[in-house]
């Protein structure tokens, strides 16, 4: 009975972290989609309007799609874990293996997307003097702040996915392989 309560507690904890990760990905996505700024610049006797938005660079587009993918995955797993958290059913070895592998995959994919967006943001903030690429953030401050917030929130989601990966690994290997390891140790100790 105590192990069932502990399992339910672990399931609720996992569901809470998954829901938080999903909400963080959605928040990061919304901030990135709203990252758009138009600036009027003087050009001779007139003005020209220049607009910068997330879709101008492939790094930000990649982060948008990965945020959608990770949020959908998190929501699907969250909904699929509700019956086991309520004690209605117990997830089997196959579903735990699937969650374990997909947690790893999505953690690394989100990490790559956040890394790509961070590099683009760094170039927008600092520029690159060797190639005479000017920094955009002094001119497009609102855009850079929105993208910075999106990348920071995405980084927190990466950390939470890494924690979920460790948690799903612990759940998988502890629940299904401890008994086999114990039996193997008992056999080896009885031989000596």
Curated annotation (Swiss-Prot):
Principal location class: membrane
Q: Which residues lie on this side of the membrane: Extracellular?
A: 33-58, 118-145
Membrane topology qualifier: Multi-pass membrane protein
Q: Does the keyword Transmembrane helix apply?
A: yes
| Localization | Cell membrane
Q: Where are the transmembrane segments?
A: 12-32, 59-79, 97-117, 146-166
Pfam families linked to this entry:
CASP_dom (PF04535)
InterPro entries with a match to the protein in the record: CASP/CASPL (IPR006459), CASP_dom (IPR006702)
Membrane side Cytoplasmic: which residues? Answer: 1-11, 80-96, 167-192
Instruction: Please provide, in alphabetical order, the Gene Ontology terms of the cellular component aspect for this entry.
Output: plasma membrane
Recite the UniProt keywords alphabetically: Cell membrane, Membrane, Transmembrane, Transmembrane helix
Does the record bear Acyltransferase in its keywords? no
The record's comment on protein family reads: Belongs to the Casparian strip membrane proteins (CASP) family.
Q: How does it assemble?
A: Homodimer and heterodimers.
**PANTHER family associated with the record:** CASP-LIKE PROTEIN 2C1-RELATED (PTHR33573:SF30), CASP-LIKE PROTEIN 4A4 (PTHR33573)
Name used for this protein in its record: CASP-like protein 2U1
Q: Which organism is it from?
A: Adiantum capillus-veneris
